[in-house]
């Protein structure tokens, strides 16, 4: 056991949720996607959920169409202005990409506290208890929010006893640290080794 290291980590945290926002319903009502036989068949704009956030994509055939961009933004700004809908913030493609999100999205949405997004189109909102998904908590919210962190702990061989890291670390720092612990050279990585934890 003297050559054993135990690592505990989480890749994300959970937030309590009780309301669901279906952005595709509003896009459908605005004529930005079409439904046939109960299924989305074509789209100019489409919302793809990430639980606590949501990507908005424009179809490649219209992604540079100023009118489609304007209509899509208007739908989203209208939803954001509603007390009874779950959009907290709308991010541009550049803002999303700078956080490491999909640079191919047109926009990205952040959910209000207690809300999350799903892809369905049949209704605009629902109480979580009325959804088949049955989620009481979910992840996918934007990083940096208060009380939205996870944990990382190591103990054992090659770990400094009693070491505490008081700075914020990212998942990619955990990966770089685990690679260093295993003496694996990952080359150039996004993360930095958390040296204060290692002997």
Can you describe what each PLM-predicted range is?
Residues 2, 148, 190:
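Residue-level signal for beta-strand positions within conserved beta-sheet cores that form or flank
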Residues 29-66, 135-176, 180-181:
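Substrate-binding rim/cap in mid-to-C-terminal beta-strand-loop elements of soluble/periplasmic
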Residues 1-128, 133-134:
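Secreted, luminal/periplasmic, and some membrane-associated catalytic domains
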Residues 122-123, 166-168, 190-191:
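Composition- and surface-driven signal marking solvent-exposed, interaction-prone regions
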Residues 7, 178, 182-186:
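Short, hydrophobic alpha-helical segments
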Residues 184-199:
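C-terminal beta-strand edge segments of enzyme domains
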């Amino acid at each position: 056991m003297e050559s054993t290291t135990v690592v505990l980590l989480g890749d994300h945290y959970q937030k309590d949720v009780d309301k669901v926002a279906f952005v595709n319903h509003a896009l459908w009502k605005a004529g930005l996607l079409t439904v046939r036989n109960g299924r989305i068949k074509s789209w100019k704009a489409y919302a793809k959920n990430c639980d606590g956030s949501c990507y908005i994509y424009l179809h490649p055939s219209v992604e540079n169409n100023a009118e489609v961009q304007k209509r899509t933004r208007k739908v989203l700004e209208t939803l954001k202005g509603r007390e009874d809908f779950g959009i907290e913030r709308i991010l541009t493609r550049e803002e999303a990409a700078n956080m490491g999100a999909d640079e191919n999205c047109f926009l990205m949405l952040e959910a209000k506290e207690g809300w999350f997004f799903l892809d369905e189109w049949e209704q605009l909102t629902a109480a979580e208890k009325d959804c088949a998904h049955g989620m009481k908590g979910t992840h996918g919210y934007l990083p940096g929010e208060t009380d939205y962190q996870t944990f990382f702990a190591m103990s054992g061989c090659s770990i400094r006893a009693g070491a505490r890291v008081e700075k914020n670390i990212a998942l990619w720092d955990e990966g770089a640290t685990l690679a260093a612990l295993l003496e694996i050279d990952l080359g150039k990585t996004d993360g930095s080794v958390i040296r204060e934890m290692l002997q």
